[in-house]
């Protein structure tokens, strides 16, 4: 399995890091077979899997449950788990308790925190305690209410300079990688050049050190409306819907189960009492 050292070496070697979200064992298993370098159990599961309209309602219990499933499905892949909304903004003791659950109970290999200079001290204390941390700057979904919605960050020079300062603060605090979301490609390239740890982009251009996308967006699974930065490589929803509709039709018409899908008995006593044939 790859490690934090591996990812830093990949940056030095110029090998892009392929990161993908997963929220359950079957998805994680397929991601591992496909050769994904790193799996993110994102709090995006709130919207993608749990039916919420934001990431805010997602709990530590949710993240523990889904991380366990992902680790069972992809035991040989490095797994990063999101710290949910407001789970790392109070006392460090409380933050450490949440991190302990995600690493020890759920089996995550690292945690991801949203924020820059404002959370650098927390990141520093976590990394000093031996916790691998991934940072997340730019468009931070947990803060969309403050940011004014899902919009591109860092377009103005002042915003870009702040994001550079955020990335520098996270690197100095010990983060081994930083996710940069929804920023101009020029800023994504600058961050990859100026920061010594991997910059993993999502809507940050092609010159970052890696890319991350949501599993369901990549395969076109219930993702009719996607962000500009998403490329859908297939569309499984119509195939799934067609299969389910065919199943319903077969049941209604008694076309399923067929003989190939049924069991039988040749016990003459049973047949004498209850009837039926021996086929």
UniProtKB/Swiss-Prot annotation:
Keywords: Cytoplasm, Magnesium, Metal-binding, Pantothenate biosynthesis, Transferase. It catalyses: 3-methyl-2-oxobutanoate + (6R)-5,10-methylene-5,6,7,8-tetrahydrofolate + H2O = 2-dehydropantoate + (6S)-5,6,7,8-tetrahydrofolate. GO terms for molecular function: 3-methyl-2-oxobutanoate hydroxymethyltransferase activity; magnesium ion binding. It is an enzyme of class 2 (transferase). Pfam families: Pantoate_transf. Pathway: Cofactor biosynthesis; (R)-pantothenate biosynthesis; (R)-pantoate from 3-methyl-2-oxobutanoate: step 1/2. Its EC number is 2.1.2.11. The keyword NADP does not apply. Its cofactor is Mg(2+). Mg(2+) binds at residues 43, 82, 114. GO terms for cellular component: cytoplasm. It is found in: Cytoplasm. Its main location: cytoplasm. GO terms for biological process: pantothenate biosynthetic process. The active site is at residue 181. Binds 1 Mg(2+) ion per subunit. 3-methyl-2-oxobutanoate binds at residues 43-44, 82, 112. The keyword Transport does not apply. Belongs to the PanB family. Catalyzes the reversible reaction in which hydroxymethyl group from 5,10-methylenetetrahydrofolate is transferred onto alpha-ketoisovalerate to form ketopantoate. Homodecamer; pentamer of dimers. HAMAP family: PanB. This is 3-methyl-2-oxobutanoate hydroxymethyltransferase. The gene is panB.
């Amino acid at each position: 399995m790859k490690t934090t050292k591996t990812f830093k070496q990949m940056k030095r070697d110029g090998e892009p890091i392929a990161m993908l979200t997963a929220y359950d064992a079957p998805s994680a298993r397929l991601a591992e077979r496909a050769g994904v370098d790193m799996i993110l159990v994102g709090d995006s599961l709130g919207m993608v899997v749990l039916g919420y309209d934001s990431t805010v309602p997602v709990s530590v219990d949710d993240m523990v449950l889904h991380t366990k499933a992902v680790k069972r499905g992809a035991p040989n892949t490095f797994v990063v788990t999101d710290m949910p909304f407001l789970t790392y903004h109070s006392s460090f003791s409380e933050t450490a308790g949440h991190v302990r659950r995600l690493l020890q109970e759920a089996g995550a290999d690292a945690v991801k925190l949203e924020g820059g200079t404002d959370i650098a001290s927390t990141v520093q204390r976590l990394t000093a305690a031996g916790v691998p941390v991934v940072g997340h700057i730019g468009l931070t979904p947990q803060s969309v209410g403050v940011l004014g919605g899902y919009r591109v960050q860092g377009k103005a020079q002042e915003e870009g300079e702040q994001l550079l300062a955020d990335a520098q603060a996270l690197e100095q605090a010990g983060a081994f990688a930083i996710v940069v979301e929804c920023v101009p490609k020029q800023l994504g390239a600058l961050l990859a050049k100026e920061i010594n740890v991997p910059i993993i982009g999502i809507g940050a251009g092609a010159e970052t050190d890696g890319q991350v996308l949501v599993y369901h967006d990549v395969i076109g699974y219930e993702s009719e409306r996607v962000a500009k930065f998403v490329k859908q490589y297939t569309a499984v929803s119509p195939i799934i819907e067609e299969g389910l509709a065919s199943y319903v039709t077969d049941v209604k018409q008694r076309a399923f189960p067929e003989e190939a899908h049924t069991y039988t008995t040749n016990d003459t006593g049973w047949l004498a009492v209850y009837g039926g044939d021996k086929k």
